[in-house]
Amino acid sequence: MTISPPESGEKDKKILESPVKADPRPIDFAKLDKPGFWSSKLSKGPKTTTWIWNLHADAHDFDIHTGDAEEATRKIFSAHFGHLAVIFIWMSAAFFHGARFSNYSGWLADPTHVKPGAQQVWAIVGQEMLNGDLGANYNGIQISSGVFHMWRAWGITNESELMALAIGAVVMAALMLHAGIFHYHKAAPKMEWFQNIESMLNHHIAGLVGLGSLAWAGHCIHIGAPTAALLDAIDAGTPLVINGKEIATIADMPMPHQLCDPQIIAQIFPGLASGTGNFFSLNWLAFSDFLTFKGGLNPVTGSLWMTDVSHHHLAFGVIAIIGGHMYRTNYGIGHSMKEILDSQQGDPILFPAPKGHQGLFEFMAESRHAQLSVNLAMLGSLSILISHHMYAMPPYPYIATDYMTVLGLFTHHMWIGGLFIVGAGAHAGIAMVRDYDPAKHIDNVLDRILKARDALISHLNWVCMWLGFHSFGLYIHNDTMRALGRPQDMFSDSAIQLQPIFAQWVQSIQASAVGTSILAGTAEALPHKAISEVFNGSLVEVGGKVAIAPIPLGTADLMIHHIHAFQIHVTVLILLKGVLYARSSRLIPDKASLGFRFPCDGPGRGGTCQVSSWDHVFLGLFWMYNCLSIVIFHFSWKMQSDVWGLTGGNFSQSAITINGWLRDFLWAQSSQVLTSYGSAISMYGLMFLGAHFIWAFSLMFLFSGRGYWQELFESIVWAHNKLKVAPTIQPRALSITQGRAVGVTHFLVGGIATTWAFFHARLFGLG
């Protein structure tokens, strides 16, 4: 890829003087009528059916459109605004539906008895069957997205506020679309601007993250927390009094702007009306009524305290603003990322790399795929972390007792995390093929890792085999012993125990730490319940349902956790092998010249198929899917058994055999989806069936040979020619890579939608 040369007379200018180029690409609407205008080959139009596949495969591969790194980077930057516009439109739709069609007000008035509903379905051919009784005289479709709980935490108390948000989100979408067009066609940033790493870190960390968190803290403090205090008091049956008036219902609530009146807010949080004098005199304890550190859950709502959440966002915002100013920008002070990396030499004994991290800054700064890979890996890991917060630290009021929402959000964030991490492997492979220059990386950390790849992959392979045989072997042993009627010889909590002693130790030290530490700057100890209740804490009940409870761990957990470890390591093995061998291998030394995706290394070279970096991503997706399926199955059954009290605590004895998983989880819990016809959850029965078909359809692509299809097409074309109705676009069988792409897509979509229907029907069916 080439990099545009600097324009004449601009080499000596500072970046801030001329960061953009005016009118680099005038808007040409004529291009939009020509599919594939960015490719001389595709713009000629279709001659065979392969054209449509190449159009989709290459439309967003900006690298190959012009070969100019600056142009590709501008397209990425512009596409970000387009992405934000789509997000705002999606948010607007959610707000609008909440305002016009949902039962938000009814749910808000009685969240422990009324279920969240999206809309009422019109009766066209019997769809009114789907309108279930959600309480408070509302019949509609039950939802599990958690938006109602989130809106209550924000401080939204009526549909008018939702409609205002819907309008605001549409306006923001229009602004984002305009920004995307403007920053590509009218004022496009130059490459030097994109490469100004320290300024970018300053802007992203201090500006977007820091100020964003601080602004959100402001909303939580002035609107969210006061509204939550009033609503919690109503729900607890002890309404607050404002200006002599009892706030007994939502209709009595002050308007949002009234909560900013010092006279009104002083009656909810006196510290909030005390003015800024306490801030500048460092008397910050005056603010401890609305910036709290209570820990644990609000017993009324079963969620984190809104005042704790406010405190968290304020602290995080301040930390990010300070952290974002660590880097050297215009004033010659602070850290230089290049200097930091170049000075890192690595461990001289464990990992000797004479040139250390030299060259790493340039590679990361110039390779968009390398940047994206790191960001996807981190964001994917963060998404998986968020999954666990859904049950360990429920963030929104009443969400913890809406079991399908907890399970749905856990599952959703798991899938997102898994897809992002596989994406990290994909873009790392592309970076190695397209952006990595071996001549620039001699004896540095990247070079040393590539030289050690055989040791890395062979050891990882050994770990996978060890984990796989041993963890699966425990289940095989238990199934055999149970079949032979020898329960005393099984691995279980009542026979041969395999207790997760390290996990239990972590739980106990978390619980024992409460009340032993001193808060910084005060003489107060950490309050009780300063950690999650799942770590040997206490049970919190809301509306007669368990919101959170200690999660005991035993032999069944140790066994399934080792299955998790096995599957995670196999997924990592596949993805890492795809990256480390992306450019070359013993089998194909010139793999880099074949590109990121190729079917085989030509005829006569047996064993060279399915070795491209793309094929590793393809295989990694299957293992990611298998891995996370077991994770969400484990979570679903464990919570139903040991926390929510829905399956009589059968996890510890049933989950120790394969037969137990098949019989007591999959079969027993699928009764709701299999018997859903004729009820309000019948759509999940149809989805369960249809998604199985989509999944099975994928096998036709994954197991097929191209020759069969091409031969079939030829005979069909012959028949059309005989009838003189032959198409002008010649049919072509899918390439090996295209077939695999279609196969894995339907496999994942079918599998995920099947699980979606299974989970929803189960928990909605139980009520």
Curated annotation (Swiss-Prot):
- This protein is called what? Photosystem I P700 chlorophyll a apoprotein A1
Q: Enzyme class, one word? A: oxidoreductase
Which membrane topology describes this protein?
A: Multi-pass membrane protein
Q: Where does divinyl chlorophyll a bind?
A: M700, Y708
- NCBIfam families noted in UniProt: psaA
Composition skew (Basic and acidic residues), residue ranges: 8-22
Name the HAMAP family for this protein.
PSI_PsaA
Oligomeric state and partners?
The PsaA/B heterodimer binds the P700 divinyl chlorophyll special pair and subsequent electron acceptors. PSI consists of a core antenna complex that captures photons, and an electron transfer chain that converts photonic excitation into a charge separation. The cyanobacterial PSI reaction center is composed of one copy each of PsaA,B,C,D,E,F,I,J,K,L,M and X, and forms trimeric complexes.
Organism field: Prochlorococcus marinus subsp. pastoris (strain CCMP1986 / NIES-2087 / MED4)
Q: Which Gene3D superfamilies match?
A: Photosystem I PsaA/PsaB
Q: How is the cofactor bound?
A: PSI electron transfer chain: 5 divinyl chlorophyll a, 1 divinyl chlorophyll a', 2 phylloquinones and 3 4Fe-4S clusters. PSI core antenna: 90 divinyl chlorophyll a, 22 carotenoids, 3 phospholipids and 1 galactolipid. P700 is a divinyl chlorophyll a/divinyl chlorophyll a' dimer, A0 is one or more divinyl chlorophyll a, A1 is one or both phylloquinones and FX is a shared 4Fe-4S iron-sulfur center.
The reactions it catalyses are:
reduced [plastocyanin] + hnu + oxidized [2Fe-2S]-[ferredoxin] = oxidized [plastocyanin] + reduced [2Fe-2S]-[ferredoxin]
